[in-house]
Amino acid sequence: FQTSWPELATLSDKDSMMFVSHYTTVNNKSVRNYSMMYDLKNKYAHWIAYPLSADYTEKNVKRSDAWEYDPKIPKDCQPTLYKGWGVGGYDRGHQLPSADRLNCYKSNAATFYFTNMTAQNSNLNQGVWMKLEDMIRDRMMPRCDTLYVVTGAVHETEDDKNTAYIKGNYGESTAIPKAYYKVLLKFTKPSAHFFEEGVL
């Protein structure tokens, strides 16, 4: 599989980790939708990497809400999230936002795979995290030809190695992330150079 995209984070060779890429169609061409490093044991993606440009965000379709299993990951390694987490205070938080993929139904539907979700604190998901996603899409993406984004989550930190879990619709245990991050890399064609935009 291809791993040469500029924004990809470190790949893991652990048996419990699986690297997956999803593709879509942009301007009648098959292109990458996003890539992920998925934790088969804890049932969430440690990071999701994706390109962001006007070709992907052009509003040709509406939010699909096509909640479904990821066809590239074994079902028994995914949480089932048709009805959310079933616990107050947690949302099905997208790592790749639905609003970043409105160019076609296929692009948007893939953002509703259960593997793109984490158990995200509702206040965070609907508050500062949503504002951050909007800022990246509306203010930072237009500054370059392509903005490469990595969104990540961690269920352990140096200070806290204990992992909390939450249940999916059929009782599957999924790790609850303790922290999230985004890393941005912008590419502008005239200079053919990459510039680090920042770590958020």
Feature-to-residue mapping (PLM):
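Domain-level detector for secreted/extracellular nuclease and nuclease-toxin modules, and
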Residues: 1-200
